Amino acid sequence: MSPALAHHSNAQRAAAAAGIVARAGRRWGLLPYQVVVAASIAANAVLRQGKSAAGAVAAARRAARAQAGAA
């Protein structure tokens, strides 16, 4: 885990993951509504599944790549 996120609550980690995905979504080629969905999925992965922020972002990125490949 990143030292910057080591002493933060799950809610703060979820917000960080959602923010990272939201900023990176356009680079990944996502449409605006897809960015919102991906950020929400990343936040839920942290809150409900206990994933790390980095793991949640990686999962969102994999999903974005898979969707882009299917189009």
Which stretches of residues belong to each language-model region?
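Long, non-catalytic architectural segments outside compact domain cores
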Residues: S2-A6
